[in-house]
Every structure is written in structure tokens, then in C-alpha cells.
UniProtKB/Swiss-Prot annotation:
Keyword 4Fe-4S listed: no
GO cellular component: cytoplasm
A GO molecular function held by the record: acetyl-CoA C-acetyltransferase activity
Protein EC: 2.3.1.9
Reactions listed under catalytic activity: 2 acetyl-CoA = acetoacetyl-CoA + CoA
A GO BP annotation: butyrate metabolic process
Localisation: Cytoplasm
Protein name: Acetyl-CoA acetyltransferase
Organism: Syntrophomonas wolfei subsp. wolfei (strain DSM 2245B / Goettingen)
Family stated for the protein in its record: Belongs to the thiolase-like superfamily. Thiolase family.
Source taxonomy: Bacteria, Bacillati, Bacillota, Clostridia, Eubacteriales
Amino-acid positions noted as binding CoA in the UniProt annotation, renumbered to this chain: R223, K224, S225, S249
Pathways involved: Lipid metabolism; butanoate metabolism
Acyltransferase found in the keyword field: yes
Length: 396
């Protein structure tokens, strides 16, 4: 008999902007904060955790096994094991579905899952410095790990922004459509922040400073804008292109976590779950149009669950770019159902801390489902390199 898997204790840090409040707070620190908070929210003891699975993409220079560092810093006993996964933008969500698989297999009852990323602290790399340079360093030999490891398609040698331009060409998506999508994201995120919509899901980050502690408790990436101002932004990746800073996601820092648990263990401990895991899937596409990844992933997850998109009450689809978000909406049949998609804005406004984003959208989905009384929810992301991942949950 297949074990039922539930989610409890979900939380996230606020999302920091590039060069912003969290720029000096490392990935291991951010991860430890959400792990500690998730344990408190779930009402369990740290020693009851069987395993930790956490996503992180930009791991160069962080030291061995970031997930292990996070858990030790969070006070989880050394006897508990941990591993870090890198499925690029899908890492945080895949960590959760991996945890569900382990629990379904009967190999664990309680798993800490999620993701962490500080893109600000990604190092520059000298890949040929091991054996020295005869004279000057060759041009192009200094690699920005943030750009290369997080934002570059290695198969074609170009920025993720070009993959969005490719989708625009394929689908005939206009600059006006992209800007309208970006403006929607900013507007909804601003409304959510102003009304305190995210307060329940956020754990503040306390940053010690010479003039006293800074309590960081609000997403800082959203920007006030107007359609007119967005229309004036120059193309960011291609001459004559239409992808701009206003219709693309940001470079950010954050962490998010959720405790994945067998339903029988939750019942035994008297814990009321936030939701149960219904299905999950991944899918592959051509790397040059990586933003289409949510299409096969979501279709597979829906098919496994015996559902259609009409059965889903709430959707969190990561906004890597407006271009890919529009294409995904068209193909998956929710372009005319946007009232249930990214209802509090998405990554264009909130930000995209790559290793954490999958867990972030899941946390946001779970709390918004509670507020609305929604029954079924879908979280999905595109993944650099040409993939997508998706997870469907049902409120309990």
C-alpha cells in the first residue's frame, strides 16, 4: 500500500534583492534559519528528522554539502544525514518531491526539504589557476559563477535571456504582452505586501550591525513602476529584442523549507498537515527554449493525478521570464484563467533566488490555499538546461 505524504511547517525568508539586505548572509545561514523555523512551526523535535534534502545551485566556494551545513547550524543532531541537490531552478521543489519518494518507499518518516541560495555571494573562478599562468591571465579566463553556473545555457553558450527571446520568436509573443505580464506581477506583489499577505509564510532574518540589529521581514525586490516606464526599458540580451529588466526575474537571495512527513506519522504526533502531496513529475525540452519545461512536467503531474487544469484551484508558476510564462499559460490552458495564477505576483516582482525558488513558490502556494480555502494547487518551474518540474498538492 502506497504511503500518503503530507506537508507541514512551511516557511521562507523574505527575498533579498541583488546587492540588498541579504547580500552578506550566506546560503548556509539562510537555510539554517528556515530549517529552525520549520521545526518550530511543525511542532516536532529536531531529532525526529530522518533526513535533510535541500537544493542549492551556486555551491562553488561554500564548502562541503551545504544542506549538511544548514542542518548543523539549525541545531539538527549530527546523527541526521543530509544531501544537497542541484536541479538548477527546480532544486527546491525537486527536494520536496524527492523527500516524498523516500517516504513513500518506507525509508523515512520525516524529511526536511527545501532550498537556499545567496546569488550575491557567488564567487569568481579562475579555472586554470591550479598550475599557474605564464604571464597575464588570458581574456575570458575569469568566470563569474553566478552568471555561468546559474544564468547561462551551457549547450548554446548564451544567457537564459536568449532562451526567452527564442520563445518569443516561436510563439509570436510581443513586447507589449511581456510588459503587461511584468506589470501585473509587480502590481499584485505590491498589493500582497501592503496588505500583509505574505506575513504568515515569512520568518524574519535578523542581521547584526554596528548600529544595532536589522530585522529583515519583507520582500525587497518589487519595484514601483508604470506601463509607460516599463515600455522605455532597453532590451537586455539582444539588439532589437523584447526581454528587459522589467519583464524578467531578478537576481536574489533567500531560503525556504517545508517538512515532508508520512500521514501516519503526522497522525501519530497529532500534527495537522497543511496539504498532502498528490503527484509530481519532471519533463525535458530543448535547452534553447528551456522556459517551456513546465509544459511537459505539469502535463505528466496532472495525468498521474487523474486531473485536468480545470481541477486545479490555485497555480504558482515561476516567472523566470514573462515570455516563457505566457507560452506556458497558452499551452497548458490557463491563459484565460489567470485569476488563479500567481495571485500575489511572481518571480518578476518577488525575485528568483534559483536554488530556493521551487520551495518558495510551494510555501506561498500552501499559505494562499489556506487563506482562500482552495482544495488543489499546482507548483511548477522551468529549469535551465531544458527541463521543468511540477508538484500537485491537496489541502487537508
Amino acid at each position: 500500500m502506497t504511503r500518503e505524504v503530507v506537508l507541514v511547517g512551511a516557511c521562507r525568508t523574505p527575498v533579498g534583492t541583488f546587492g540588498g539586505t541579504l547580500k552578506d548572509v550566506g546560503s548556509a545561514q539562510l537555510g539554517a534559519i528556515v530549517m529552525g523555523e520549520a521545526i518550530k512551526r511543525a511542532g516536532i523535535k529536531a531529532e525526529q528528522i530522518d533526513e535533510v534534502i535541500f537544493g542549492c545551485v551556486l555551491q562553488a566556494g561554500l564548502g562541503q554539502n551545504v544542506a549538511r551545513q544548514c542542518m548543523i547550524n539549525a541545531g539538527i543532531p549530527k546523527e541526521v544525514t543530509a544531501f544537497t541537490i542541484n536541479k538548477v531552478c527546480g532544486s527546491g521543489l525537486r527536494a520536496v518531491s524527492l523527500a516524498a519518494q523516500v517516504i513513500k518507499a518506507g525509508d523515512a518518516d520525516i524529511i526536511m526539504a527545501g532550498g537556499t541560495e545567496n546569488m550575491d555571494k557567488a564567487p569568481f573562478i579562475l579555472p586554470n589557476a591550479r598550475w599557474g599562468y605564464r604571464m597575464s591571465m588570458p581574456k575570458g579566463d575569469l568566470i563569474d559563477e553566478m552568471v555561468w553556473g546559474g544564468l547561462t545555457d551551457v549547450f548554446n553558450g548564451y544567457h537564459m535571456g536568449i532562451t526567452a527571446e527564442n520563445i518569443n520568436d516561436m510563439y509570436g509573443i510581443t513586447r507589449e504582452e511581456q510588459d503587461a505580464f511584468g506589470f501585473r506581477s509587480q502590481t499584485l506583489a505590491a498589493q500582497a505586501i501592503e496588505s500583509g499577505r505574505f506575513k504568515d509564510e515569512i520568518v524574519p532574518v535578523v542581521i547584526k550591525g554596528k548600529k544595532g540589529d536589522i530585522v529583515f521581514d519583507t520582500d525587497e525586490h518589487p519595484r514601483k513602476s508604470t506601463p509607460e516606464a516599463m515600455a522605455k526599458l532597453a532590451p537586455a540580451f539582444k539588439k532589437g529584442g523584447s526581454v528587459t529588466a522589467g519583464n524578467a526575474s531578478g537576481i536574489n537571495d533567500a531560503a525556504a523549507a517545508v517538512i515532508v512527513m508520512s500521514k501516519e506519522k503526522a497522525d501519530e504526533l497529532g500534527i495537522k498537515p497543511m496539504a498532502k502531496v498528490v503527484s509530481y513529475a519532471s519533463g525535458g525540452v530543448d535547452p534553447s527554449v528551456m522556459g517551456l519545461g513546465p509544459i511537459p512536467a505539469s502535463r505528466k503531474a496532472l495525468e498521474k493525478a487523474g486531473l485536468t487544469i480545470d481541477d486545479i484551484d490555485l497555480i504558482e508558476a515561476n516567472e523566470a521570464f514573462a515570455a516563457q510564462s505566457i507560452a506556458v499559460a497558452r499551452d497548458l490552458g490557463w491563459a484565460d484563467k489567470m485569476e488563479k495564477v500567481n495571485v500575489n505576483g511572481g518571480a518578476i516582482a518577488i525575485g528568483h533566488p534559483i536554488g530556493s525558488s521551487g520551495a518558495r513558490i510551494l510555501v506561498t502556494l500552501l499559505y494562499e490555499m489556506q487563506k482562500r480555502g482552495s482544495k488543489k494547487g499546482l507548483a511548477t518551474l522551468c529549469i535551465g538546461g531544458g527541463m521543468g518540474t511540477a508538484l500537485i498538492v491537496e489541502a487537508l
